[in-house]
UniProtKB/Swiss-Prot annotation:
Gene designation: hisF
Keyword Heme: no
Protein known as: Imidazole glycerol phosphate synthase subunit HisF
Family: Belongs to the HisA/HisF family.
Keywords carried by this UniProt record: Amino-acid biosynthesis, Cytoplasm, Histidine biosynthesis, Lyase
The species this protein was found in: Shewanella halifaxensis (strain HAW-EB4)
Length: 257
């Protein structure tokens, strides 16, 4: 059995790590490189960095800190933010990132996924999906440009359909960001994640809702995701990564300790 991964997420805005609630009201939580180093030392399996306003502001993720992170940590890390071209992706990988993640630019041009996959291989192409549960229609919809509240907009895509489309285009991994759960620490959306798991043939990462160690146990055992991403519980010291991994191991979840 493949070990489940614990993935701290660092949202980056203007060179600082920030965290919001339901993608709004972001506050500064620390500096990029020290936080990355801390999580690597605490036993994280991987890190994800999102430059949250890059796509909305029509720019690309700042490369200056990518090489500094690569020098300080020895675990894989993924970067995201406004990557729209092969050249931009190549630059980020050359600076030391192991994977690149595409979200809003893929919604604008789905064929970007296939082009990136052809150039770099599926294994380093991650698709982030910001999924919002619309109670009025009882449906899951994909939103775009979510890093800037003023720029966020609805798309034509239902989440299930977009998951199938990005796989068809050649993505290697999917991060499902459940917007309704983001930052509220009430648990992952097991229902939605289980539904997506049933149509997802690539590794699936759960994002949004972690508040306790039991939430991680539940998302692994009930939704069968490959990794669980979280931010505020790690930034605020609510959960220690080593203690979390021991807890999961004690609950028969395969993890690297």
């Amino acid at each position: 059995m493949l070990a489940k991964r614990i993935v701290p997420c660092l949202d980056v805005k203007e060179g600082k790590v920030v965290k919001g609630v339901q993608f709004r009201n972001h506050e500064i939580v620390g500096d990029i490189v020290p936080l990355a180093k801390r999580y690597a030392e605490e036993g994280a399996d991987e890190l994800v960095f999102y430059d949250i306003t890059a796509s909305a502001h029509d720019r690309v993720i700042d490369k200056s800190w990518i090489s500094r992170v690569a020098e300080k940590i020895d675990i894989p890390f993924c970067v995201a933010g406004g990557i729209r071209t092969i050249e931009q992706a190549r630059e980020k990988l050359a600076f030391g990132a192991d994977k690149i993640s595409i979200n809003s630019p893929a919604l604008t041009d789905p064929s970007l996924i296939a082009r990136l996959q052809d150039e770099f291989g599926r294994q380093c192409i991650v698709i982030g999906i910001d999924s919002y549960y619309d109670a009025s229609s009882d449906s899951y919809r994909v939103k775009q440009f979510t890093g800037d509240e003023a720029a966020t907009k609805d798309t034509q895509w239902y989440t299930q359909d977009w998951v199938e489309e990005v796989q068809k285009q050649g993505c290697g991994e999917i991060v499902l960001n459940v917007m309704n759960q983001d930052g509220v620490r009430q648990g992952y959306d097991i229902k939605q994640l289980s539904m997506i798991r049933s149509i997802c043939d690539v590794p699936l990462i759960a994002s949004g809702g972690a508040g306790t160690m039991a939430h991680f146990r539940d998302v692994f055992s009930r939704a069968n995701v490959d990794a669980a991403l979280a931010a505020s519980v790690f930034h605020k010291g609510i959960i220690d990564i080593q203690e979390l991994k021991q807890y999961l191991k004690d609950n028969q979840i395969a993890v690297r300790v």
